């Protein structure tokens, strides 16, 4: 065996040095590759492991009525998210409690509160990743419960982030007008959709830092800029609508009452300023609560006031009458022969009651809604003029109102019209319209001939108070002369005072209007048997109109004539509004004085001992005051404050009421008050 020599030791030492050098060089090369080549990738992986990317939603701008009363506001509320890796067995928090399954405990405790399936929640907790939303914009009570569970059970990886939640202060009131937003803070319908770019702030994106246990690091934000953005919320404009909240409430209440009484499939009502085009009130049925819009059918989201198309029936007759007056074919005194029915080609058209009045002036044709006279006028006008004037009055095209979802309506091509088509159009059939189109056209009669563009956005105000945008009166065109408008107003006033619209009369006030009853169009074409559209449109006072209103009921059950079901809604709604707004009767004949000191009734002279007030009780009910000694206007205002409905008897000063003073009632209750 060869002896180990000094030279052998040197050789082995050399090999060891070479080996160490190779290892060292390998480490250097590896570090260099990681530091230079993969630096960006590794940095991203590190950030992904320690941060969660979030988007901060800023509160949307407010929506208020014409007087600044809030309709839609944003409040800050907690949104719950989980860091699944922070709940894993490898996290420091989990290792500190090795005897329990944190994820199972969290799923069992939170599922009932969050109204989520336990197993689905458990899978979320075990799915990995650093950030998963569990529930966004929670209710305050719900958030409080969850925070308590997390704290008491020391559950890791569960955190809250403050987010903006939209709140509609009056619930169902003006629901279709306001619309609603989705979970991503984007407007999905109504004004929320129409002005989404104005109301929605810019999203702030930032990263939330977490420690090895999955707990949010103090401060929580990766950079100082993001922290300052979260602390200082973006200020956004306020949108003022033309709506009057008090009038809107009365209108909504009237719609609810109408649906309850008639069992109609749907309804729409609009109140408009006939001289400016401002929408003061607008309601649609069925309706919904935008705070919980997903609990309602999509049909309830639709605003029938602008989107429903139907044949107008007799409410279209004043429009055709204006055509004849403008063309010089007729005057209010032109005599027509009403035989009760009339044959046009192979079609026989009857009056609504089948009766004939003989020789009568055109004013009587309008007053009693006589089909035969209107057909004769329509045939004299002819297809071309009928369609041309209908277009001038705004039919067949959208009004341009600043709301989404408006329909155009349908007009014939005059070249395709046969004689029966001309005849039926003259009585409001064979033409499809929307409620807003009809009301706008009638407003042209009310205001002296101006066709206006209706609008519902009064102004948009910046946070500093400057006006960004302001709605204004827009005259689309003059469709008739003031003389023609005056003649038709007089005839429409006779409809209410002497004709088929008596059920719309309000004692002491001059009302002009027109009833309408039309067969409902069937989806497959033709008409739906036994289904009708009942409507009434009018304005008050007849000589100097302040309010124009349309009421339309879709398929009422039982009574279905416009005079039976729609005209009374017009009357009851405007009666409350006229009193509340202090608009005095123009005709005091048969009416007691509104002045308490002029009455001869001792009870009516009795002054209120204290100023009556509506009191909201702890149980949510409303305590009625004693209305004795106050006038109808103040009574109506008080009841509107409590979302109560007034059913007045007489006029002047209150002396009796039902329910009695101090009775506790719920919202929507009708309070009967007698005045002298």
Segments the model singles out, each with a brief description of its role:
Residues 508, 522, 551-555, 561-567, ...:
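Ligand-recognition elements built from short beta-strands and adjacent flexible loops
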Residues 55-59, 263-266, 454, 648, ...:
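Short, small/polar residue-rich loop motifs at catalytic or cofactor-binding pockets
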Residues 3, 7-41:
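Hydrophobic alpha-helical transmembrane signal-anchor segments
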Residues 72, 213-230, 269, 274-314, ...:
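Beta-lactam-recognizing serine transpeptidase/beta-lactamase-like catalytic domain environment
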Residues 50-52, 81-99, 107-111, 128-137, ...:
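Second-shell loop/turn segments in exported
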Residues 105-112, 123-235, 551:
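Small/polar-residue-rich segments within soluble enzyme cores
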Residues 58, 74-86, 184, 281-287:
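Short beta->alpha transition motifs characteristic of CBS
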Residues 222-267:
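Conserved, well-ordered alpha-helix/loop/beta-strand core segments that scaffold catalytic motifs
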């Amino acid at each position: 065996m060869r002896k180990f020599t000094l030279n052998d030791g040197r050789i082995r030492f050399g090999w060891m040095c070479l080996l160490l050098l190779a290892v060292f060089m390998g480490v250097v090369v590896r570090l260099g590759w990681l530091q230079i080549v993969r630096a960006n990738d590794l940095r991203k992986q590190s950030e992904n492991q320690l941060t969660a990317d979030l988007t901060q939603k800023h509160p949307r701008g407010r929506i208020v009525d014409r007087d600044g009363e809030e309709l839609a506001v944003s409040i800050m509320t907690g949104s719950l998210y989980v860091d699944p890796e922070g709940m894993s067995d490898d996290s420091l928090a989990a290792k500190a409690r090795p005897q329990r399954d944190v994820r199972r405990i969290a799923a069992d405790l939170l599922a009932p509160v969050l109204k989520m399936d336990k197993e689905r929640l458990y899978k979320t907790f075990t799915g990995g990743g650093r950030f998963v939303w569990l529930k966004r914009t929670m209710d305050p009570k719900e958030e409080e419960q969850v925070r308590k569970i997390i704290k008491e059970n020391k559950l890791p990886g569960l955190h809250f982030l403050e987010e903006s939640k939209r709140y509609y202060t009056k619930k169902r009131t003006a629901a279709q007008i306001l619309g609603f937003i989705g979970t991503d803070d984007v407007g999905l319908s109504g004004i929320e959709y129409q002005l989404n770019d104005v109301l929605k702030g810019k999203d702030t994106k930032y990263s939330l830092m977490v420690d090895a246990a999955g707990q949010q690091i103090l401060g929580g934000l990766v950079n100082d800029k993001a922290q300052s953005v979260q602390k200082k919320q973006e200020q956004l404009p306020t949108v003022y609508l033309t709506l009057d909240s008090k009038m809107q409430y009365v209108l909504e209440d009237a719609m609810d009452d109408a649906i309850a009484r008639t069992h109609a499939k749907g309804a729409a009502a609009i109140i408009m300023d006939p001289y400016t085009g401002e929408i003061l009130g607008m309601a649609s049925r069925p309706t919904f609560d935008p705070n919980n819009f997903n609990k309602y059918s999509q049909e309830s989201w639709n605003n029938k006031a602008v989107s429903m198309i139907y044949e107008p029936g007799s409410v279209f007759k004043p429009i055709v009458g204006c055509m004849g007056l403008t063309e010089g074919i007729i005057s209010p005194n032109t005599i027509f022969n009403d035989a009760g029915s009339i044959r046009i080609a192979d079609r026989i058209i009857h009056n609504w009651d089948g009766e004939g009045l003989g020789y009568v002036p055109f004013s009587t044709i309008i007053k009693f809604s006589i089909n035969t006279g209107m057909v004769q006028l329509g045939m004299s006008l002819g297809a071309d003029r009928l369609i041309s004037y209908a277009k001038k009055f705004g039919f067949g095209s959208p009004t341009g109102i600043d709301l989404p979802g408006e329909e155009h309506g349908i007009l014939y091509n005059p070249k395709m019209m046969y004689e029966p088509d001309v005849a039926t159009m003259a009585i409001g059939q064979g033409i499809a319209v929307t409620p807003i189109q009809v009301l706008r056209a009638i407003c042209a009669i009310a205001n002296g001939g101006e066709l206006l563009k209706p609008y519902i956005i009064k102004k948009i105000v910046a946070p500093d108070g400057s006006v960004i945008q302001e709605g204004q009166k827009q005259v689309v065109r003059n469709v008739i002369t003031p003389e023609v408008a005056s003649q038709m107003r007089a005839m429409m006033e006779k409809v209410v005072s002497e004709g088929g619209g008596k059920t719309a009369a309000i004692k002491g006030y001059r009302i002009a209007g027109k009833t309408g009853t039309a067969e409902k169009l069937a989806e497959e074409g033709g008409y739906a048997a036994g289904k009708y559209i009942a409507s009434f449109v009018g304005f008050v006072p007849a000589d100097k109109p302040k309010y124009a209103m349309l009421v339309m009921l879709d398929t009422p059950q039982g009574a279905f004539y416009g005079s039976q079901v729609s005209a009374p809604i017009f009357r009851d709604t405007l009666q409350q509004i006229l009193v509340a707004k202090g608009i005095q009767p123009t005709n005091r004949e048969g009416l007691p004085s509104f002045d308490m000191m002029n009455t001869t009734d001792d009870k009516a002279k009795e002054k209120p001992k204290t100023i009556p007030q509506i009191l909201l009780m702890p149980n949510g009910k409303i305590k009625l005051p004693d209305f004795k000694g106050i006038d109808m206007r103040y009574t109506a205002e008080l009841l509107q404050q409590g979302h109560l409905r007034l059913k007045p008897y007489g006029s002047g000063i209150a002396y009796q009421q039902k329910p009695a003073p101090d009775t506790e009632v719920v919202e929507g209750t009708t309070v009967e008050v007698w005045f002298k």
